[in-house]
C-alpha cells in the first residue's frame, strides 16, 4: 500500500505484512543513575495473581453451573522505533518494567512514579511465542474443552495490537501472531472426522458490522437471544476450516478488505475493529451407545443415550487504536472514523467501569462493540486482554489511560460455563439408519423364509409323486409276474395229470384181457409209480400255493409302503401348514416391531422436548434439584458449599462425608442406576485415599461392598474405580489381611484376567502390589493366583501397568529376602518358580525409569538368597546385576548390587570363571 500524505484518506489493506515490532537498531538508555538518586513515591495497584487466561478449574457438571473467572490482563511494551530513538534521546523512559515481579512503573515526573501490577508483564524483547503461551493458550485450551473464550488487544494506535494478534509470519515464522498460532493448536487437537471448525471474520466500521470475507455484505444485524442473552450474527459468512493453509488464505483475504489509513502516529492505522470468531464443535467419546439387535427391544430402549457435543467459541478482537485528534492529524473522513473509534472505545470503558464497580446497570447497548463483547466482560467466557503501550514520554497520557483501562478490566468477574449438549440429531440419524437396516434385514429374512418354504414344498411334492409312480409300476410288474408263473404252473400240472390218467387207463385196458389174478397183481405193480408221481405233483402244488402266498404278502408289503408314503405326504402337508403359520406369526411380529419402533420415535421426540425444556429451566433458574439418586448425590455435593461458607477450605469429598454420612454413600453402591454406582464408588475411592477415613470405611462394610462390586458387576468403569479404592485400603496392614480373608486376591485376579483397559489393569496391579508387601501373606498370595495375575497383566504393555507389576514383584522379593535373612525361608523364590525371572531380565534395561528402578530392586533382593543364585546365573540375571553395580543412577541400588555380588559364593565363582572384575 502506498500513501501520499500523513493524513491520507481511507484505503484497503492488500494483504502485505505489517511493520514488525522489532526495530532495526536498539539504543541502550541507562537511567540507573537517575533512579538511584531520586526517591520515588510509588502507588501499587494489586490484583490476585493467577495464571493468565485461565480462571478457575473446568466445570464438570455439564455446563449448568458457572465457575468464577476473572478477566486476565497482560501488558506488552513496544520497542522504540527510529523516530523515537532520535526524538526522545534526551528524555528518560516513562515506563519501567519489572517482569519478574509482574509490575510496571509509570514515571509521572522526576520524583513520583505509579506502580501497577498485572497478570503478566511482557518486555519489548518478548517473543510472539511467549506472548501466545501466556495470553492466549489457556483460553484456546478452554475453547477445546467447550468454554467460550475471548482474546482482545487494546492500546494506543501504533503500539502493536495487530502485530500481536494478526501477524501471518509469511517472511519469518517466529513472527506469527495469536490468530495463526491458536488455529494451529486447535487443528492439532481436533479430529476432522468427528469434529468441525468454522470461522467468521468481521470488522466493526463506523458502527456497522461488515463481513471481511464478503465485502458486499456490509451491514450485518446483531441478534440477541431473549432467553439467555447470547449474541449471534446470522448474516455473517461461515467458512469451515480443514487445514492451516486455508485459514491463512482466509486471514489474507480479510486483511485485504479491512479499512486502514495513514496517520501521523501510524502509516497503516486500523480504522475498524476486527473480530475473528472461531466455532469449535467436538463430539465427546462415551461408552454408551445403541445396543445390538440380539439384546432385545426392552434393553435397546433403556440404553438410548444421545452422544454429547461440546461447542466452544473463540473470539479474537483486534481493537482499533485510541488516538487524540491533535496528535494523529486526522481530518475529513479520517476524522469521522477517529470519532467513531473513540466513541466505541469510550462505551467499552464505561461498561468495564460499571462491571468493576458492580453497578446494577451496565450500558452494553450504547455501542455495537459492547453488544458484541457482552459475553466477554461479565458473561460466561474466559477472557484475556493484552494492552499494548509505547515507550515514548510524549504519549504519557495515552499510556496512562491504557494502563488504567487494563487495571479496571482486571476487576471484572466472569462466570465461566461449559457449553455441552446432547446431540439428539445425531442419535435420530443413527436410529433411522438402524431402523432402515432392520427393515431391510427383516425383508431379506422374510423373502428367504418364503423361498425356502416353497422349495421344500415343491421338493416334497416331487418326491411323493415319484415314489408313488415307482411303487405303482413295481407293484403292477410283480403282480403280473406272479400271475403268469401261477398260470404256467397250473397248466403244467393239468397237462401232467391228464397224461398220467390216459396212461393209467391204457394200462388198465391192456391188463383187462388177461385173467383176473394176473390183472390184479400187474395192476398193483403199475399203480405204485403213478401214486409216487401224484405225490410229487401234490408237493409241487403246495410249493405253488406257498409262492402265491409269498406274492400276496409282497403285494401287502408294497401296499403298506404306499400307505407309509401317503402318511409322509400328510406329515409334509402338516409341516407346510406349520411353516405357513410361522410365517404369519413372523409377519405379526414384524408389525409389532414396527409399532414399537414408532413408539421409540415418539419417545425420542418426547426426550428431545423434555431435554429442551429442562435446559431452558436450568438456564432460567440455575442448577435445581432433580429426582433420582445421582442428582441427589450431586446436589449434596454442592449443598455444603452453599450452606456453609466456612467449609471452603475443606475438600469437596470431606464436606460430602460430613454432610451426607458414610452409610448413605455406601448404600448408593447398590443402586440400580449404573451412573449412580459409578459416582458413589468414586466418592468412596477419594475417601479411602485419606488414611483417617480407612478404618471407618472398613468398619461400615465398605471393603465388602467394593469386593461385591468386583464380583457382581461387569462395568469396567466400576471395576477400575473399585480396584483403585481397594488399592488405597490395601496400604494398611490390617486391611490387607481382611482383603485376603474375604477372597479379595481371587476377585482381583479375575478382574485382571477379564479387563482390557490399561487404567483398570493399573489399579488392580497397584492393589496386588500393596498386598505383596506383607510378609504374612506370601504363601497365600501365591496359592490364590496373585503372582500369576501380576505376570498376566504384562500383556497390556502400558508403562503405568508395567510399573505397578514391577513394584509388586519388588515388594514380594523384598519380603522373601527378609525371610531368608531371618532363616524362615529356604529353597528357591516363589517368583522364580512362577516364571517371573525371565520377564524381570527382559525388562531390566527398559527406558521407563519407574519400571527399571523396581526391577533393579527386585533383582538385588532375589540375589541376596543363595538358593536363587544358580537360576539367576542360568537366566542371565547375574549380568544385569553387574550392569546395575556399575551403571545404575542411584547410589543405594548400585551399592546393594555390588554388595550382593561380592557376598554370594555362586556369583563369585562364576565371575572368576569368566574373568570378570567387579571391583
Swiss-Prot record:
Coiled-coil stretches: 428-492, 530-621
Q: In which tissues is it expressed?
A: Expressed in leaves, guard cells, trichomes, vascular tissues, stele of the root tip region and columella cells. Highest expression detected in guard cells.
Motif annotated as D-BOX, chain positions: 382-390
Which portions of the chain have biased composition (kind: Gly residues)?
52-66
Entry text on domains: D-BOX motif functions as a recognition motif for the ubiquitination machinery.
Q: Could you tell me the keywords of this UniProt record?
A: ATP-binding, Coiled coil, Cytoplasm, Cytoskeleton, Microtubule, Motor protein, Nucleotide-binding, Repeat
Record localization: Cytoplasm, Cytoskeleton
InterPro entries the UniProt entry points to: ARM-like, ARM-type_fold, Armadillo, KIF11-like, Kinesin_motor_CS, Kinesin_motor_dom, Kinesin_motor_dom_sf, P-loop_NTPase
Q: How does it associate, per the subunit comment?
A: Interacts (via C-terminus) with NEK5.
ARM repeat copies, ranges: 650-689, 691-731, 733-773, 775-814
What biological process terms from GO does the record include? microtubule-based movement
Check the record and name the Pfam families matching this protein.
Answer: Arm, Kinesin
Q: Which family does it belong to?
A: Belongs to the TRAFAC class myosin-kinesin ATPase superfamily. Kinesin family. Ungrouped subfamily.
Q: Where does ATP bind?
A: 155-162
Return the protein name. Answer: Kinesin-like protein KIN-UA
- The biased composition feature labelled Polar residues covers 291-301
Q: What happens when the gene is disrupted?
A: No visible phenotype.
Query: Which SMART domains does the record match to this protein?
Result: ARM, KISc
Indicate, by first and last residue, each region the UniProt record lists as having compositional bias (Low complexity): 15-51
Q: Keyword Cytoplasm, does the record have it?
A: yes
Tell me the superkingdom of the source: Eukaryota
Single GO cellular component term: cytoplasm
What is the source species?
A: Arabidopsis thaliana (Mouse-ear cress)
Q: Annotated region Disordered: where?
A: 1-68, 286-305
Amino acid at each position: 500500500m502506498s500513501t501520499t500524505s500523513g493524513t491520507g484518506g481511507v484505503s484497503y489493506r492488500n494483504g502485505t505484512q505489517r511493520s514488525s515490532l522489532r526495530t532495526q537498531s536498539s539504543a541502550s538508555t541507562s537511567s540507573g543513575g537517575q533512579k538511584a538518586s531520586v526517591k520515588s513515591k510509588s502507588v501499587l495497584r494489586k490484583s490476585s495473581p493467577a495464571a493468565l487466561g485461565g480462571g478457575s478449574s473446568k466445570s464438570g457438571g455439564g455446563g449448568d453451573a458457572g465457575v468464577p473467572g476473572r478477566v486476565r490482563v497482560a501488558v506488552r511494551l513496544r520497542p522504540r522505533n527510529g523516530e523515537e530513538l532520535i526524538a526522545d534521546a534526551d528524555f528518560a523512559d516513562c515506563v519501567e518494567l519489572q517482569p519478574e515481579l509482574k509490575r510496571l512503573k509509570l514515571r509521572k515526573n522526576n520524583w513520583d512514579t505509579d506502580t501497577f501490577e498485572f497478570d503478566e508483564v511482557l518486555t519489548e524483547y518478548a517473543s510472539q511465542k511467549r506472548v501466545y503461551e501466556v495470553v492466549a493458550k489457556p483460553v484456546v485450551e478452554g475453547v477445546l474443552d467447550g468454554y467460550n473464550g475471548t482474546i482482545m488487544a487494546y492500546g494506543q494506535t501504533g503500539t502493536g495490537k495487530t502485530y500481536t494478534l494478526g501477524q501471518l509470519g509469511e517472511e519469518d515464522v517466529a513472527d506469527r501472531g495469536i490468530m495463526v498460532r491458536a488455529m494451529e493448536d486447535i487443528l492439532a487437537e481436533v479430529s476432522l472426522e468427528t469434529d468441525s471448525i468454522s470461522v467468521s471474520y468481521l470488522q466493526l466500521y463506523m458502527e456497522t458490522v461488515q463481513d471481511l470475507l464478503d465485502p458486499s455484505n456490509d451491514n450485518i444485524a446483531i441478534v440477541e437471544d431473549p432467553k439467555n442473552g447470547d449474541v449471534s450474527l446470522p448474516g455473517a459468512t461461515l467458512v469451515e476450516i480443514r487445514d492451516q493453509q486455508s485459514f491463512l488464505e482466509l486471514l489474507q483475504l480479510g486483511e485485504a478488505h479491512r479499512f486502514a489509513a495513514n496517520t501521523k502516529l501510524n502509516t497503516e492505522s486500523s480504522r475498524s475493529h476486527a473480530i475473528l470468531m472461531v466455532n469449535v464443535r467436538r463430539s465427546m467419546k462415551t461408552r454408551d451407545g445403541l445396543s445390538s439387535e440380539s439384546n432385545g427391544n426392552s434393553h435397546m430402549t433403556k440404553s438410548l443415550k444421545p452422544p454429547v457435543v461440546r461447542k466452544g467459541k473463540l473470539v479474537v478482537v483486534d481493537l482499533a487504536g485510541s488516538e487524540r485528534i491533535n496528535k494523529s492529524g486526522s481530518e475529513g473522513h479520517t476524522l469521522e472514523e477517529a470519532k467513531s473509534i473513540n466513541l466505541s472505545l469510550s462505551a467499552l470503558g464505561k461498561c468495564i467501569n460499571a462491571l468493576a464497580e458492580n453497578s446494577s446497570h451496565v450500558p452494553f447497548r450504547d455501542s455495537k462493540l459492547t453488544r458484541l463483547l457482552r459475553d466477554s466482560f461479565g458473561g460466561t467466557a474466559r477472557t484475556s486482554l493484552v494492552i499494548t503501550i509505547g515507550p515514548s514520554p510524549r504519549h504519557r497520557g495515552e499510556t496512562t489511560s491504557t494502563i488504567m483501562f487494563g487495571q479496571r478490566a482486571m476487576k471484572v468477574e466472569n462466570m465461566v460455563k461449559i457449553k455441552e449438549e446432547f446431540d439428539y440429531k445425531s442419535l435420530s440419524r443413527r436410529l433411522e439408519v438402524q431402523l432402515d437396516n432392520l427393515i431391510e434385514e427383516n425383508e431379506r429374512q422374510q423373502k428367504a423364509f418364503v423361498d425356502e418354504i416353497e422349495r421344500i414344498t415343491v421338493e416334497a411334492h416331487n418326491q411323493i409323486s415319484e415314489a408313488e409312480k415307482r411303487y405303482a409300476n413295481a407293484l403292477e410288474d410283480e403282480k403280473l409276474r406272479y400271475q403268469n408263473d401261477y398260470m404256467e404252473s397250473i397248466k403244467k400240472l393239468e397237462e401232467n395229470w391228464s397224461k398220467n390218467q390216459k396212461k393209467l387207463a391204457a394200462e388198465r385196458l391192456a391188463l383187462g384181457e388177461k385173467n383176473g389174478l394176473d390183472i390184479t397183481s400187474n395192476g398193483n405193480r403199475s399203480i405204485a409209480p403213478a401214486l409216487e408221481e401224484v405225490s410229487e405233483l401234490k408237493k409241487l402244488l403246495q410249493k405253488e400255493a406257498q409262492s402265491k402266498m409269498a406274492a400276496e404278502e409282497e403285494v401287502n408289503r408294497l401296499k403298506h409302503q404306499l400307505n407309509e408314503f401317503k402318511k409322509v405326504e400328510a406329515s409334509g402337508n402338516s409341516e407346510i401348514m406349520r411353516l405357513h403359520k410361522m410365517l404369519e406369526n413372523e409377519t405379526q411380529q414384524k408389525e409389532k416391531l414396527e409399532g414399537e419402533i414408532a413408539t421409540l420415535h415418539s419417545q425420542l421426540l418426547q426426550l428431545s422436548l423434555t431435554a429442551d425444556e429442562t435446559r431452558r429451566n436450568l438456564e432460567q433458574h440455575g442448577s435445581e434439584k432433580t429426582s433420582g439418586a445421582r442428582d441427589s448425590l450431586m446436589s449434596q455435593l454442592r449443598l455444603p458449599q452453599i450452606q456453609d461458607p466456612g467449609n471452603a477450605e475443606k475438600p469437596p469429598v470431606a464436606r460430602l462425608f460430613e454432610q451426607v454420612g458414610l452409610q448413605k454413600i455406601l448404600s448408593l453402591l447398590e443402586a440400580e442406576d449404573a451412573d449412580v454406582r459409578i459416582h458413589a464408588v468414586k466418592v468412596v475411592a477419594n475417601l479411602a485415599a485419606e488414611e483417617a477415613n480407612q478404618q471407618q470405611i472398613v468398619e461400615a462394610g465398605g471393603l465388602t461392598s467394593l469386593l461385591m462390586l468386583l464380583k457382581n458387576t461387569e462395568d469396567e468403569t466400576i471395576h477400575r474405580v473399585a480396584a483403585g479404592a481397594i488399592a488405597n485400603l490395601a496400604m494398611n496392614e490390617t486391611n490387607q489381611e481382611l482383603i485376603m480373608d474375604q477372597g479379595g486376591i481371587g476377585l482381583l485376579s479375575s478382574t485382571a484376567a477379564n479387563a482390557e483397559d490399561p487404567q483398570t489393569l493399573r489399579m488392580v496391579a497397584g492393589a496386588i502390589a500393596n498386598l505383596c508387601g506383607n510378609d504374612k501373606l506370601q504363601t497365600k498370595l501365591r496359592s490364590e493366583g496373585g503372582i500369576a495375575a501380576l505376570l498376566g497383566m504384562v500383556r497390556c504393555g502400558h508403562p503405568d501397568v508395567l510399573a505397578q507389576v514391577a513394584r509388586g514383584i519388588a515388594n514380594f522379593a523384598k519380603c522373601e529376602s527378609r525371610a531368608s535373612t531371618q532363616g524362615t525361608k529356604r529353597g528357591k523364590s516363589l517368583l522364580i518358580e512362577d516364571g517371573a525371572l525371565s520377564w524381570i531380565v527382559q525388562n531390566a534395561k527398559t527406558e521407563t525409569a519407574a519400571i527399571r528402578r523396581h526391577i533393579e530392586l527386585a533383582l538385588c533382593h532375589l540375589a541376596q538368597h543363595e538358593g536363587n543364585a544358580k537360576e539367576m546365573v542360568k537366566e542371565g540375571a547375574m549380568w544385569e546385576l553387574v550392569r546395575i553395580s556399575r551403571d545404575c543412577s542411584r547410589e543405594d541400588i548400585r551399592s546393594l548390587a555390588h554388595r550382593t555380588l561380592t557376598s554370594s559364593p555362586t556369583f563369585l565363582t562364576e565371575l572368576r570363571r569368566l574373568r570378570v572384575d567387579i571391583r
